[in-house]
Structure formats: structure tokens, C-alpha cells
């Protein structure tokens, strides 16, 4: 990757997206560096958008594993990513987007109209089932089937765009 960045150093560019010529599922996004995904898998489009969320917006994965190999996020430290929290410094995250009286943790939404938009504090994110929270029941940073980023991720991406354009 360093060679690619060096090669592009004299050319004005905004972001690197690398498409691998394979139908194997996968991808990765390194914040402030690049997006990598496979070009011929049926889930290419949602995966490249998800990985772009990491590499451009600094967004965290909002999914959790049944058995995380080791906690990536200690529960007594607030993650730097804007879309997950341990509640240590929640006021710096999306607390201002909660409706008054929203319970913490928030029960997952079952109404299809609300699963992508109802901002709360839903447990299970950052690869961990307990102690790490995400802003909505579902989001592009959690599942490939989500049609959009959640409101918290959208706000964060908008702030990043404004940082570079205003």
C-alpha cells in the first residue's frame, strides 16, 4: 500500500478504492488510507459501501460475534469511532440524537420502518455482544442488507465531508 500511496503522491486524489478481480467474498477499509473489496461477488456493492464507511468515515463495525476471540474494545474506555460506545463518554457520541426517555440499553426495533432510523443505544457492536453499543437496530455498518447508513453514521460522514469541503 505504501507503494501505491507513493505512486499517487504527485496526483491529486481523494480516496483509493482497490477492487480485487475475484468472486470471493470480502473486503477491508483502513481509515484515511484505502478501501479494498472483491469485484465479482454478488454482495460487491453493499460491501464496498460498508468498507468505505471504515476508510473514509472512520466508522466501526456494528456487528458482534457469539464468541469474540478477545475483546477489541475494553469496556472501560470509550472507542474513538463515532458509531459505537461503551457509555464511558457517551455525551461525545450520539446522546444528543436520542429522544427524551430513551432507555439504555434500548430494546431492538422490530418495526421495519424503524430498524434503520430509530436512534437508541442497542447492545452488541465492535465484535462484542455485551458492553459495546450501536445507534440503531440495523445499519450498513452492521448488515449488508441495510439500504442506508443509520442517522448517526450519516451525521458522521457528513461532518467528514464538511471538514474537507468547507
Task: Name these PLM-found stretches.
Residues 1-67:
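Active-site-proximal segment of zinc-dependent metalloprotease catalytic domains
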Amino acid at each position: 500500500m505504501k507503494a501505491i500511496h507513493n505512486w499517487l503522491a504527485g496526483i491529486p486524489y481523494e480516496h483509493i478504492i482497490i477492487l480485487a478481480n475475484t468472486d470471493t467474498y470480502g473486503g477491508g477499509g483502513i481509515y484515511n488510507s484505502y478501501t479494498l473489496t472483491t469485484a465479482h461477488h454478488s454482495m460487491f456493492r453493499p460491501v464496498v459501501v460498508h468498507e468505505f464507511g471504515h476508510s473514509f468515515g472512520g466508522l466501526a463495525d456494528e456487528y458482534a460475534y457469539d464468541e469474540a476471540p478477545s475483546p477489541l474494545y475494553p469496556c472501560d474506555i470509550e472507542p474513538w469511532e463515532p458509531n459505537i460506545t461503551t457509555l464511558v463518554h457517551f455525551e461525545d457520541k450520539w446522546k444528543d440524537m436520542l429522544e427524551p426517555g430513551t432507555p439504555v440499553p434500548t430494546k431492538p426495533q422490530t418495526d421495519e420502518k424503524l430498524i434503520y432510523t430509530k436512534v437508541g443505544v442497542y447492545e452488541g457492536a465492535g465484535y462484542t455482544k455485551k458492553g459495546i453499543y450501536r445507534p440503531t437496530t440495523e445499519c450498513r455498518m452492521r448488515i449488508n442488507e441495510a439500504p442506508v447508513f443509520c442517522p448517526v453514521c450519516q451525521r458522521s460522514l457528513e461532518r467528514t465531508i464538511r471538514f474537507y469541503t468547507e
